[in-house]
Amino acid sequence: MKILMAEDDFVTRKFMVGFLSKYGECDVTVDGMEAVDAFMMALEDGEPYDLVCLDIMMPVMDGYQALMGIRNLEKDRGIPEDKRAKVIMTTALNDEKNVKMAFELGCTIYSGKPIDKERFEQAMKKLGLIQ
């Protein structure tokens, strides 16, 4: 599995990479702009990401803008919805407004912080990313 993570907090990045790296290659970006750029490069190389983990509150470009950029790249390339990357929002913003916005923009699962490894792994199983 190929994983892209956009997270500006060092401790969270280290934690997430620590448990996600056992499932596959994990690329890390620190803002939404880098995430969209990395996603585009992966598509151009013919090696798209299977899973994208996006924080919402990040510098340069927030997670919502990054999610829109990622979904637009997939749409522009004619990638069918069932073949698109699974996007899990990983954020401390757990209020109804933010959850609703993320799903409207195309996230697959919303996972509030602090991240619970077991729940996160269950979400990945539900998405068919791991056994």
Feature locations, PLM:
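Alpha4 helix (beta4-alpha4-beta5 surface) of REC/receiver domains from two-component response regulators
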Residues: 83, 94-109, 122
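Helix N-cap/capping motif at the beta->alpha junctions
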Residues: 10, 28-41, 63
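Conserved acidic carboxylate
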Residues: 7
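Receiver (REC) domain active-site loop signature in two-component systems and cognate sites
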Residues: 58
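Short amphipathic alpha-helix used as the core "switch/output" element in two-component signaling
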Residues: 37, 41, 64-82
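Charged docking surfaces used in two-component/phosphorelay signaling
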Residues: 14-21
